[in-house]
Amino acid sequence: MCQNREHHREGWLALSGLVSAGLALPVAPSAWHGPEVAAILAVAAIALLAGQRWAVAVIVLAQLCLLPTVWPRAVLGAGGSPRLIALATLTAIIPGVLAMPRAAVALAAMTGHDQTERICRCTHVCLLAIGVFAVLAPLL
């Protein structure tokens, strides 16, 4: 039962990764490294669908890297379809932000550290710091 629920959450995370990657591509060409990050996000989402657990960390990092590209267009951009696409992309990024604790565990495992509570907490704090920087970077 618990394993089925976890598989269901990973499916939603992979689906949101594919959707946010697809939606970010029309917005991304005028921004910094947007297409590259969207491509990495799409590949990681497909890897997660194939059962690769490390892809959770890559999806979360890629979605955090898409934030500086997308949120200014959603909040500060001109109206019309580009703004709606940016808002839909931000909505699709939400499951990745909510998966940060699982990404912290996956990152701790990828680096070869023991998955102690302290290491996972520090990794989670680092992911949160990256998220804050990603939100503030366009304002600098």
Language model features: what each stretch is:
Residues M1-L140:
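Topology signature of small-to-medium multi-pass alpha-helical membrane proteins
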